[in-house]
Design a protein with these regions (language model features):
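N-terminal pre-domain/capping segments
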Residues: 6-30, 35-42
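Hydrophobic faces of well-ordered beta-strands that scaffold small-molecule active sites
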Residues: 7-11, 30-32, 59-63, 95-97, ...
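Catalytic cores of alpha/beta
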Residues: 14-24, 68-86, 130-146, 167-180, ...
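A structural motif
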Residues: 27, 56, 91-92, 120, ...
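Ordered, amphipathic secondary-structure segments that act as subunit-interaction surfaces
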Residues: 82-99, 103-106
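Long hydrophobic alpha-helical segments typical of transmembrane helices together
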Residues: 191-231
């Protein structure tokens, strides 16, 4: 049975084990990826299908074919298009992506094309926004012009709490929902929400394993959700 929170909590999951832990912690929405150690890459089709159909989670799928910058070649874009189409077929709720131009600005043209291809799935523009060489409000308007439903951001700072002032300034400017993420934990989520006014938060609630990788911790997920119940 899921807990009912006025704050929509999204858990970043890098594997099936993490997705199971997120569900055990009463989450019902995840961002699914792999290789979180390098910032996250596109997960496998098998993992997407399992999370959607077996776990019954609202699954937002990261579309990122490689580590590094967010300026993609035509071949990489074609790969991303194929993945987006497959996510739609598999029943994903949303895809998560981001494109920058060679000048470091939001690539409105390519992003809008991907949003159109993804429909009726929602599209979240990810933290490529935080690397954009633009004023955050200007960049937000570009995200809006791309027709994205949501923006995942730390306010162009290393953590969402550090970027709280910028995050607050983004809310309500356009119709884009602001999802605060980066360094969000059960210990600081209340402070973040109170400082910014966001209604959506993103965290991994992860613990380190002996091999240097990470996995979602169900107890931390439950604590995160508990902390948001009275906000």
């Amino acid at each position: 049975m899921y807990l009912c929170s006025m704050i929509d909590v999204e858990i970043c999951c890098n594997s099936i084990a993490s997705a199971v832990a997120a569900k055990d912690g009463c989450a019902d929405r995840i961002e699914l990826c792999r290789d979180l150690e390098c910032g996250g890459l596109t997960p496998s089709e098998e993992d997407i299908a399992y999370c959607v159909h077996h776990l019954g989670l609202r699954t937002h799928v990261l579309i990122r074919p490689r580590p590094g910058n967010f300026c993609y070649t035509e071949a990489e874009q074609m790969e991303m298009i194929a993945t987006i189409k497959r996510c739609k077929e598999l029943g994903a709720k949303a895809v998560v992506l981001g494109f920058l131009t060679e000048e470091g600005k939001i690539d409105v043209e390519i992003t809008r094309r991907m949003v159109q291809l993804a429909s009726p799935m929602e599209v979240t523009f990810h933290r490529a926004f935080d690397e954009a060489l633009q004023d955050p409000i200007e960049a937000l308007w570009d995200v809006a012009a791309s027709r994205c439903h949501r923006l995942l951001t730390s306010g162009q700072r290393p953590s969402a709490l550090e970027g709280a002032e910028v995050i607050k300034s983004l809310i309500g400017v356009t119709g884009v929902e602001i999802l605060a993420g980066a360094g969000v934990t059960p210990m600081n989520v209340r402070e973040l929400v109170e400082k910014t006014g966001v209604r959506e938060v993103h965290g991994s609630c992860k613990k380190s394993l002996d091999d240097g990788t990470f996995v979602t911790d169900a107890a931390s997920v439950r604590q995160m959700i508990d902390k948001t119940l009275t906000l």
